[in-house]
Amino acid sequence: MRYTLVLIIILYSTTLLKAQEIQNFDNRFQLAQSYEQAGQLGKAEAIYRELAYAQPWNNIFFETLNKILVSQKKYTESIDLLNNKIKQTPTDFNLYGLLGSTYFIMDQSEKAFETWERGIAINPNSIVGYRVIANYALVNRAFEIAIDILKRGKKYSEDPTIFSIDLANIYAVNMKFKDAAAEFCTLIIHHPEQVQLAKARMNIYLKGHGAVEQTIEAIKDFINSKSQIEFYDLLSFVY
């Protein structure tokens, strides 16, 4: 009985200490954020470093530290931080995305693209890798690179249409409305029930110059090659 009581006390004390430690980390993180918002980046960085080293598995602490290094143009430190992390977890797509982003911000675009390709090469059959890396290219407005990555990812996907919406959005942003419409039509071929989604997404860009004409042309091309009732519905919507 006494042994059980002692064990309960020990477990309770350990749990309490752990809870206090977590609360302390949360408080420190909030303090660092306050410093950052106040423009005291050096003080914020010091706390972010402290937290990242105390909990090396915590991706939020790690990525926040990297972010503040980049915001201070401490690019070499960001690169070192990310490379060291890659050595520890070499299969993390996200790390290659972040490292490539640092190079891209430094105007070392070729090195950025090489780094993103290294990320994809971890597992070239993984659709997750293509989408993660493409997202970093998008964030950096490297649209052509993002398009290339997503199109390559389609080849390895059992359902290539999961890339169609991403591609359509990029095409629309770059005023390639015919290409955007073609991706939505591809989506509808495989998933006719998604016609309403296609309409909603198209409606976002149809006011763009030449968007209606290009979209109609794309839909008609699909009607000519594969007559499907949803395409007529879509065409009527665009008109």
Regions found by a protein language model. Name each.
Residues Q37-A38, S71-Q72, I105, V139-N140, ...:
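Register position in tetratricopeptide repeats
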Residues L17-N83, T91-N94, E114:
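N-terminal leader/linker segments that initiate helical-solenoid repeat arrays
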